Design a protein with these regions (language model features):
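Conserved AdoMet/S-adenosylmethionine-binding subsite of the radical SAM
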Residues: 1-172, 182
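C-terminal accessory regions of radical SAM enzymes
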Residues: 153-155, 160-208
Length: 208
């Protein structure tokens, strides 16, 4: 019988959203996995430091079958986080959470996406992010740019951006002027971002 990995979270939901602190749905799932007669590997994708609460369960899962913690981290700028990720755990607490899981013997990866045009995609910002990841000795980093699908998603982001940094709204709209169904920006911008990321990876000796 084929065995797979149990995945908690995705690009549109977080298993450790604020309600989890009281409802403990993910905690109960983690405990079930940790004690199951079927030793199944698992991974968690989150931007919340609340995951550290359940480290005893996830460590047991890791010891039995393997566990990966994937943390969303795109910048070290707390002012940016407060504007674009209100209610989310601080970047500093996410870094500390990853450090704790690494010390516990778990694999840890960083989802460095989306890097926001004009906000978190500068060389200096990406370099600082990769340096922080190197300091923790994360196992891998998965970077990616921002997609803005035409319609509600794009309108929501531009509204938030206009409130935070109205000076870069026009340049952001220009990047996405092709209105691709995928939400991808102009290809020249995608290629340029990938080249810069690769250069910075080499600079900080993180050859993922």
């Amino acid at each position: 019988r084929e065995r797979g990995i149990i995945s908690f979270g995705s690009g549109v939901t977080d298993p450790y959203q604020n309600l989890e602190s009281t409802h403990r749905i993910t905690a109960r799932c983690a405990e079930l996995l940790a004690d199951s007669i079927h030793a199944l590997p698992a991974q968690v994708m989150t931007k919340s430091s609340l995951v550290a609460r359940d480290l005893p369960f996830w460590r047991r899962v890791n010891d039995r079958a393997g566990f990966i913690l994937l943390v969303s981290l795109t910048s070290l700028d707390e002012q940016l986080r407060e504007a674009m990720e209100p209610g989310a755990s601080s970047f500093a607490s996410r870094i500390e959470t990853m450090r704790v899981f690494k010390k516990a013997g778990c694999r840890v990866g960083v989802l460095a996406m989306p890097l926001l045009p004009g906000l978190s995609d500068s060389d200096a910002s990406i370099r600082a992010l990769y340096a922080a990841c190197a300091d923790i000795c994360v196992d891998f980093v998965m970077p990616g740019g921002l997609t803005l699908r035409p319609g509600r998603q794009k309108e929501f982001y531009i509204t938030a951006l206009r409130a935070f940094r109205s000076d870069i709204v026009d340049s952001t709209l220009d990047l996405y002027r092709n209105e691709r169904p995928s939400g991808m920006p102009r290809q020249v911008a995608v290629a340029a971002l990938h080249r810069r990321i690769q250069s910075i990876r080499l600079e900080v000796s993180m050859l993922f």
